[in-house]
Each structure stands twice: as structure tokens, then as C-alpha cells.
């Protein structure tokens, strides 16, 4: 049984990428094949991705768009607050985290961005319901700030507003970017199209829980955050066609992976084939999990002791990921959201009995 300590590693702080590279495809790409032993590691650049995949393969992208979900404001008493929108729940309502010296009660009015007032509604642990005076997506876009991850040490600027979004983002609702997709630009997508690689999209709105640390040594006790996803019938059809022609299903990012595997696991449990799905998922993928859909994964380098490091370890193999991360640190790859990428091939068999 793996414990939290099994997913720890020492990362020199200077390897945490603080800014995006000028060219999206200039990032490095570590190709990792966990289906062979010892694992095969190849140093590349992301622009070489087309040479790593085949015509007839299917790339699955998450088209969520990051909201300008961060606000500073004050209570009627003058006390300062910080608000992070977690999820838009209706035209005029959202769930949010609120940092304040004292938690506001229901009925409290909060002034945000010195521009408009919201009213606090019921508590939905650990969030607060906020009622907006106008469509909240409009107010968020007009007055909010882009919420960069906690390990990025500068406030979001105009460059971040472009580079912390994928070029294909179209469905507003995330509070963090699906960062594997940040490496794709339109010329690369056009090149993949021209060589006969299929593309499809799903939506999973990434929540702030993606940065939530695991606080228990026994990882089986960890409570995973929940996120909403939409897997359309067009994607289901493309997966079936890819399987029929012997192609690989390649998830672009762990969010695409989690949506695909959540839908497939639910279908398995119901005794039916994969189908279009709109649902919440709190799927927690750890070593021993049996992957049902995804053959390969494009992903960034993840934080020590994180659920995402556990996910990639389940996919490619614990020792394979350890070797890959050691190599990446030795070769000075850039880590986390603005960092470099990996292309992982699935380990053939799970490492231990699992879901």
C-alpha cells in the first residue's frame, strides 16, 4: 500500500516556472514510455509532438476557460476580504471561498473590486453562496482578476490573461487552467489536423481544490474535491471510431483524463457502454487503478505529494515516474503550470489491485 511519503521529492525552487515562455510550443517535452522496462525517456521539444503520435490517434482536450475569479473587497464595516469564486451555480449565484478576519454571516453585503455589491447566502462547506446583482459571469469578466496558482509569485498581468488560457478555451467556469493544453498553439493544432490526428473536446471546470494538499499519510483516507464535467456524444463516437481503427486515445491533461475515466467507470458500474455524461466527479486515481479509456497522456510536472502526481504514477508506474522526475530535475526541466510537459504511455498492468 502506497503512502503519502511515497510521492514526495525534493524540487529546487528555481525550477518552478514563474512565467510562460514567449512561444507556447518552445517548452520541452519528456517522452516517457512506461509500457517497457526500464522505462524509455526521450528529451524533446513540444513542437515535436506530431512525430510522437500517429494518424488516426485521438487527442482529447478540455475546453474550459479560466474565470477572472479573484476579487479583493470589503465588508460594510470596512474589514478587508479576499474572494475566490469556486463555481458559478446560476445566472446570479456562485460558490466562493472568502478570506476575512471573521466569516461573514448570511445576509451580509460585501463590496467587491469597489464596483458592485454581493449578498452572502447559505454556507455550503467550505464555500459561501454569493448572490450577484447582475449576471455573475459578466461581472467576473469585467471586474475580477485572473487567479494564478499559489506557487506563482507575481500578480496576474496582461500576459498571463493570454498565456494562462488555452487557445481553444471556450466554456467559462474554471478557476485554474488545464495546463497541459497551454503548450498548443493554432499552427501546431493545424499541423496535427493535416497529418490525420483526430481532435475532440470535453469540459471539466477545474476547481481550486486542484491545489488542495493531501494531509493524511494513508492516501486512502484523502477526501477528493468534486468537479463538474460534460462528456458529449460526439466524443463518445470518436473514441469508438478510434478504437475500431486501432488508434490511441490521448488525454491532453489530467482534467481530460479524470473526466474520461470517471465517465467510463460509471458506465462500467452500471453495466453499460460509455455514453454522453454530465456529472460531478470526485474520482481519485492512485496506483492500482484500472484505466478504461486513456492510452497516452500529455501532462505537466506536478507538485510533490499531490493527487496529480499519484494519478500519473498510477498511469505510467510509480518507479517510471520517479525515474522521469529525477531525470527532469537533473536536466533542469521547468515545473508546474508554466513549466514543461511530459508525454506518458500507459503501463500495461496496474501495480496493485484497484478500482
From Swiss-Prot:
Purpose: Transfers and isomerizes the ribose moiety from AdoMet to the 7-aminomethyl group of 7-deazaguanine (preQ1-tRNA) to give epoxyqueuosine (oQ-tRNA).
Listed GO MF terms: S-adenosylmethionine:tRNA ribosyltransferase-isomerase activity
This protein's record includes keyword Nucleus: no
Gene3D superfamilies registered for this protein in UniProt: QueA-like
Quaternary assembly: Monomer.
SUPFAM superfamilies tied to this protein: QueA-like
Family according to the record: Belongs to the QueA family.
Domain of life: Bacteria
EC number(s) reported in the record: 2.4.99.17
Compartments in which it is found: Cytoplasm
Transmembrane segments: none
GO biological process per UniProt: queuosine biosynthetic process; tRNA wobble guanine modification
Pfam families hit by this protein: Queuosine_synth
Organism: Burkholderia cenocepacia (strain HI2424)
A cellular-component GO term for this protein: cytoplasm
Keyword list, A-Z: Cytoplasm, Queuosine biosynthesis, S-adenosyl-L-methionine, Transferase
Catalytic activity: 7-aminomethyl-7-carbaguanosine(34) in tRNA + S-adenosyl-L-methionine = epoxyqueuosine(34) in tRNA + adenine + L-methionine + 2 H(+)
Gene that this sequence comes from: queA
Protein name per its UniProtKB record: S-adenosylmethionine:tRNA ribosyltransferase-isomerase
Pathway of action: tRNA modification; tRNA-queuosine biosynthesis
